[in-house]
Amino acid sequence: MLKSLQLQAQMTEEFGACVFDVTLDCEDGAPVGDEAAHAVLVAALARDAAPAARVGVRVHPVDHPAFANDMATIAGEAGHRLTHIMLPKVESVDDVLRAEKTLQGTSAAHLPLQVLIESPAAVHRAFEIAAHPRVQSLSFGLMDFVSAHGGAIPASAMASAGQFTHPLVVRAKLEIASACHAHGKVPSHCVVTEFSDMVAMQAAASRAAREFGYTRMWSIHPAQIRPILEAFGPTQDDIEVASKIIAAAADADWAPISFEGALHDRASFRYYWQVLERAHSTGRSLPAAVCPWFTPSVSLCP
């Protein structure tokens, strides 16, 4: 966990902005029987993180005996430094309501919740879960989802290639992405477990971003971060086109414009503005014409 925070600080200095979140883990990261001590450690790491750090915590599921203590210790002691709480194994909006009520009993009632969707029932309720105002993001938990099918889905569906071809996994991914976009939330793609295979990582991240509608992706190893940023960021050509269209639109007070023989109006302005936002959030360099809109992170601009 400490190495992840150190890498985040190094890349923030490199890019001039924080380009990825760190989620400290209490669910799978805590030894059985040592959950309370692990929560204290996580709270301390979050409190001591760099000022520009974006740090969240994955607590235990709401029905786990350690959940209440996780929330009291971590949200209560480090809530002012956290960007989010990650809830694993959410089955319905009732789990979100329970977590929200628990948060309200701490000094971090403002914190958004990021939710892990990890079962067929949760996928079925993804739209309802995404609609809750406290929910910021839905993430797909691939391995738990496959395991929840009792052997009906082969192990190959958990691999980097198979997870994009098995029909039930593909359906789940698309449902989650669609639910997020319907309610203005962030869809976060699942991990790739082959952490030493950068070709597989790049291919999976590219498909998640280009074909499945995901705007973020989990990593499980530092070597995966740059391929994810590369895949989820726009190309330099995309950035140049978006910058020219947005600059021309601003000059026209956002009235329809003609650009290279094509009509653009507010619908396409929104799209190209989102291209620039993705460029900024993934550490891309921005043309001078659009830099003023992205201050104070002026170091990304020429």
Model-found features: residue ranges?
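Expand to "…catalyze enediolate/carbanion chemistry for C-C bond making/breaking, isomerization
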Residues: 1-302
